[in-house]
């Protein structure tokens, strides 16, 4: 691992609801975090492990970002 990779600062989500831009920035950092159920103004951000759903949150839910950050920290696979 190069030092630049080791010290890379990852973008997380705010503790509450989050925007599409924030979700896209986070999903772009991980191989197993995706935007699904896209209905335009609202969508789900999901974490999967070997195709199995680990956690999902609608972008407008209270505390959505807080819980998503916890599951990404524990299960996220960096690109």
Swiss-Prot record:
What the entry lists under SUPFAM superfamilies is as follows: YcfA/nrd intein domain
Pfam families referenced in this protein's UniProt entry, alphabetically: DUF905
Q: What keywords does the record list, in alphabetical order?
A: Plasmid
InterPro entries recorded: DUF905 (IPR009253), YkfF-like_sf (IPR038612)
Query: At the top level of its lineage, which domain of life is listed?
Result: Bacteria
- Stated family: Belongs to the UPF0401 family.
What this protein is called in its record is UPF0401 protein YubL
Q: Which organism is it from?
A: Salmonella choleraesuis (strain SC-B67)
